Amino acid sequence: MYGIEYTTILIFLTSITLLNYILKSITRIMDYIIYRFLLMVVILATIINAQNYGVNLPITGSMDTAYANSTQSEPFLTSTLCLYYPVEASNEIADTEWKDTLSQLFLTKGWPTGSVYFKEYADIAAFSVEPQLYCDYNLVLMKYDSTQKLDMSELADLILNEWLCNPMDITLYYYQQTDEANKWISMGSSCNVKVCPLNTQTLGIGCLITNPDTFETVATTEKLVITDVVDGVNHKLNVTTATCTIRNCKKLGPRENVAVIQVGGANILDITADPTTTPQTERMMRINWKKWWQCFYTVVDYVNQIIQTVSKRSRSLNSSAFYYRV
């Protein structure tokens, strides 16, 4: 009997000793792994000095403070600037080194080499389809053209604001706009847009829903159309779908890291009077037209003042993807 008790006690003590040994071994192994990991982190931190310019990476968070207008301002070292210009600018300059020249000039204003990106676009229609406003700050140069002033004004409204859009099937359904922030956006090589307001019996008001020729014309041969109709009223739409797409969109608010610079023109585009533009902050500027070199020199000279009108933020880097979000 005493032998059985001694054996039980011995087994119990042996188990405790073995468990204690195992726990100590696990502790030593974990300490080894943790210390090695921390050592590697310290070593890598001393030899790696990477900078994230944010290109092709999502930017989220609250609005940052506007930077001071100074050629010695160090915050620009961690910011990127995209300058969008029409293809005719590079064609006129005809210099393979012109971007390098501008980069060196931007350096004198506190923008390091490699922080300024030059983005070329063919025309307003192509740019409106896929703006790709990737940088922390985005400046869009648009040369004034009296034949495209409506497209220019609506392009400014498109890129200076953020929109949530859904596709529309105008062959099957009637549509109505719920409030002032609700617009119908059409874009393509040639957009003709006609509307027919309907009463509560779905009969046309001043038009016949079966005859598009009686519809009210709101746009003719435009590349970009932002249509605003009477809220709360159903409409039958007629759009040249072969050369144009239309979407039902909601203006979410200002895209605060974008500024539009109008180049030349006697008339000045201004969308701040739009009641849906809140806050009504002027982020559209105009510079006199001479030659494209002169325009770029002006932008470089006043870049830090222009940056004061915008903020380093954006809900979506790829504005076209955000625009087509369904």
From Swiss-Prot:
<feature type="binding site">
    <location>
        <position position="228"/>
    </location>
    <ligand>
        <name>Ca(2+) 2</name>
    </ligand>
</feature>
<dbReference type="GO" id="GO:0039624">
    <property type="term" value="C:viral outer capsid"/>
</dbReference>
<comment type="subunit">
    <text>Homotrimer; disulfide-linked. 2 Ca(2+) ions bound at each subunit interface in the trimer hold the trimer together. Interacts with the intermediate capsid protein VP6. Interacts with the outer capsid protein VP5*.</text>
</comment>
<dbReference type="InterPro" id="IPR042207">
    <property type="entry name" value="VP7_1"/>
</dbReference>
<feature type="region of interest" description="GPR motif; interaction with ITGAX/ITGB2">
    <location>
        <begin position="253"/>
        <end position="255"/>
    </location>
</feature>
<feature type="glycosylation site" description="N-linked (GlcNAc...) asparagine; by host">
    <location>
        <position position="69"/>
    </location>
</feature>
<keyword id="KW-0732">Signal</keyword>
<feature type="binding site">
    <location>
        <position position="95"/>
    </location>
    <ligand>
        <name>Ca(2+) 1</name>
    </ligand>
</feature>
<dbReference type="InterPro" id="IPR042210">
    <property type="entry name" value="VP7_2"/>
</dbReference>
<keyword id="KW-1152">Outer capsid protein</keyword>
<feature type="disulfide bond">
    <location>
        <begin position="191"/>
        <end position="244"/>
    </location>
</feature>
<comment type="function">
    <text>Calcium-binding protein that interacts with rotavirus cell receptors once the initial attachment by VP4 has been achieved. Rotavirus attachment and entry into the host cell probably involves multiple sequential contacts between the outer capsid proteins VP4 and VP7, and the cell receptors. Following entry into the host cell, low intracellular or intravesicular Ca(2+) concentration probably causes the calcium-stabilized VP7 trimers to dissociate from the virion. This step is probably necessary for the membrane-disrupting entry step and the release of VP4, which is locked onto the virion by VP7.</text>
</comment>
<feature type="binding site">
    <location>
        <position position="214"/>
    </location>
    <ligand>
        <name>Ca(2+) 1</name>
    </ligand>
</feature>
<dbReference type="GO" id="GO:0044166">
    <property type="term" value="C:host cell endoplasmic reticulum lumen"/>
</dbReference>
<feature type="disulfide bond">
    <location>
        <begin position="82"/>
        <end position="135"/>
    </location>
</feature>
<keyword id="KW-0167">Capsid protein</keyword>
<feature type="glycosylation site" description="N-linked (GlcNAc...) asparagine; by host">
    <location>
        <position position="238"/>
    </location>
</feature>
<feature type="binding site">
    <location>
        <position position="301"/>
    </location>
    <ligand>
        <name>Ca(2+) 2</name>
    </ligand>
</feature>
<dbReference type="Pfam" id="PF00434">
    <property type="entry name" value="VP7"/>
</dbReference>
<keyword id="KW-0325">Glycoprotein</keyword>
<dbReference type="GO" id="GO:0046872">
    <property type="term" value="F:metal ion binding"/>
</dbReference>
<keyword id="KW-1146">T=13 icosahedral capsid protein</keyword>
<keyword id="KW-0946">Virion</keyword>
<feature type="binding site">
    <location>
        <position position="216"/>
    </location>
    <ligand>
        <name>Ca(2+) 1</name>
    </ligand>
</feature>
<feature type="disulfide bond">
    <location>
        <begin position="196"/>
        <end position="207"/>
    </location>
</feature>
<keyword id="KW-0945">Host-virus interaction</keyword>
<feature type="binding site">
    <location>
        <position position="206"/>
    </location>
    <ligand>
        <name>Ca(2+) 1</name>
    </ligand>
</feature>
<feature type="region of interest" description="CNP motif; interaction with ITGAV/ITGB3">
    <location>
        <begin position="165"/>
        <end position="167"/>
    </location>
</feature>
<keyword id="KW-1038">Host endoplasmic reticulum</keyword>
<feature type="signal peptide">
    <location>
        <begin position="1"/>
        <end position="50"/>
    </location>
</feature>
<dbReference type="GO" id="GO:0039621">
    <property type="term" value="C:T=13 icosahedral viral capsid"/>
</dbReference>
<keyword id="KW-0106">Calcium</keyword>
<feature type="binding site">
    <location>
        <position position="231"/>
    </location>
    <ligand>
        <name>Ca(2+) 2</name>
    </ligand>
</feature>
<keyword id="KW-1015">Disulfide bond</keyword>
<feature type="glycosylation site" description="N-linked (GlcNAc...) asparagine; by host">
    <location>
        <position position="318"/>
    </location>
</feature>
<feature type="binding site">
    <location>
        <position position="229"/>
    </location>
    <ligand>
        <name>Ca(2+) 2</name>
    </ligand>
</feature>
<protein>
    <recommendedName>
        <fullName>Outer capsid glycoprotein VP7</fullName>
    </recommendedName>
</protein>
<feature type="disulfide bond">
    <location>
        <begin position="165"/>
        <end position="249"/>
    </location>
</feature>
<comment type="similarity">
    <text>Belongs to the rotavirus VP7 family.</text>
</comment>
<dbReference type="InterPro" id="IPR001963">
    <property type="entry name" value="VP7"/>
</dbReference>
<keyword id="KW-0479">Metal-binding</keyword>
<feature type="binding site">
    <location>
        <position position="177"/>
    </location>
    <ligand>
        <name>Ca(2+) 2</name>
    </ligand>
</feature>
